[in-house]
Amino acid sequence: MARKRLVVIGDEIDGIQAAARAVRENPEIEAKVLIPGEHLSFNRYILAYFIQNSDEDVFSFMGSVMENFKAHYGIEIITHVRVTGILPLERKVVFEGLEEGSSSAVEYDRLLIAAGLVPTVPEVEGINLGNVVFLGSLNDVMAIQEGIKAGQIKKAVVVGAGMAGVYTAESLWKRGVKVTLVEKGPQILPELDMEMAELVKKQMVRKGVEVLVGEKVLSLIGNAKGDVVEVHTPEHILPADLVIWLEDMRPSVEMARKAGIIIGASGAIEVDQYMETNVPGIYAVGSCAQRIHHITGKPVCLYRQAVDDAVLKVVSENIASGNSCTLEKGVLCTMSIQAFDLGMARTGLSLQQAREEGYEVETAIVSVYDDRYAYGGSYRENAVKLMVDRSNGKILGVQCVGGVLSDKLVDTVAAVMSMGGTVRDLAVLDVANHFSYSMNLHPIALVAHVMLNKLKGKFKGISPFELNDIMQNEEAILLDVRTGSEFKMGTLPGAINIPLEELEARKDELDRQRNIILISERGRRAYLAYIRLRQMGFERLSVLDGGLLLYPFE
């Protein structure tokens, strides 16, 4: 019996890992992988990690990875080739060697596309200058490492402030490079809501990173050698020895499109529950493959931080033994990074996304301890923001910014969301708790109980972003209910101070016809003040969600 031929197109590591699993499932499979360079490709998070770890010999590491795939699974890796055509009727892939220019073809029984993402090269003057990189390969990493070691890279500009941009900025900062992060949108980290992203921005600025938002790069200026030396925005001229451009990544789908493969609404390759395209025998995996969002049911394109094990299992089993395995659930777009001594994690929908989907959204923000609080060591605050459908309590999303607890909290909520859970399920979830994280309620239970109180109408909250807007446009009373000594140490502009214990005696100092926003350190005393003032007949009340500790605006 002839061996089944599997061909993988693309250097994204998901492809060769799926091939290895398929060979493990069916040893009769003969697998070949066609890649454009000398090595497989990692995503930009891992490439950024290599930048900050100067002692890591990335080429030796990747060489050993590729040798393991060859030795353990018999996979043939054909390097330095460019695929020029997919011929579904003939079941052939045509390619040419990039070094010798010769043209060849390979036949397949199953074809797997793992082409990953490619940058959209902007129409910006100077984009082709030296030392302007899109951080797409190990060669980029090595060039950056060598430039830093030689003292040639002292100032860098990172363009694009998503999670990959923030992580890349940290990698350069850890190497002693002066970093400027430039984002054309109104905030860094569009994966997070504004007030959560601002917490990260404040930390980055505190660490010495310059952060510019709402600024589009207009041009890059080079020297006589053709290397970049300046980045021009509408407001700044930024000196730069290196520019890393991370804006506007898109799935690499042109070869698939030419072969008659349907490209989905997200811009990625459309696949079914078997990860198979509309062309029988051709599958897609990784960042170039479209997924379905678990909450909205709509197609999405994911820039994954790691290999999706569930997808690899499905596609490898189907390649090995026919379409017998299906992908049961959609994705929640869960992401997390650790950067600048902060953990950042999110899952589900952001507030803006949820509203765009037509949900009536309720939010709750709490501050919880993180790290080693109870042991007398250092600790950090962890901001937790939960979003639910006001009509039924269905969980729509959660975001965390703080210490090492962030991804644990998000992972736990993501598990409940994948089961269709509600905030009531969170409130009664039996999870491992420890007094180093919470003296009373587990953080998940805490944010769930705050949310339930809101849904029951026990109090009304206001987000930091909403309060910042009100302070610019409306005359509301900002009532700080902390002690006088705490108030003197710092509060919000225009706030007045009536300590919680003095509310009854001093209630006549408050105008009942104006909106009163109650603030305290974490929001707990403000909540008690809300209850007491309601009992005194005040109606136009709200509590600052998360308290002053989580208010990120100046």
Language model feature labels by segment:
Residues 155, 165-221, 300-308, 325-351:
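Rossmann-like dinucleotide-binding cores of NAD(P)H-dependent redox enzymes
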Residues 21-108, 193-210, 351-353, 446-450, ...:
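N-terminal Rossmann-like dinucleotide/flavin-binding domain of flavoprotein oxidoreductases
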Residues 113-175, 264-265, 270-273, 496-500, ...:
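Glycine-rich dinucleotide-binding loop and its adjacent helix/turn
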Residues 424-476, 484-554:
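Rhodanese-like catalytic fold shared by cysteine-dependent sulfurtransferases
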Residues 2-76, 169-192, 326, 334, ...:
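Beta1-alpha1 glycine-rich phosphate/pyrophosphate-binding loop at the start
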Residues 2-5, 288-404, 435, 439, ...:
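Mid-to-C-terminal Rossmann-like scaffold of FAD/NAD(P)H-dependent oxidoreductases
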Residues 30-32, 72-74, 78-99, 106, ...:
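A Rossmann-like FAD-binding core segment of flavoenzymes
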Residues 128-152, 238-317, 412, 416:
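FAD-site-proximal beta/loop scaffold in flavoenzymes
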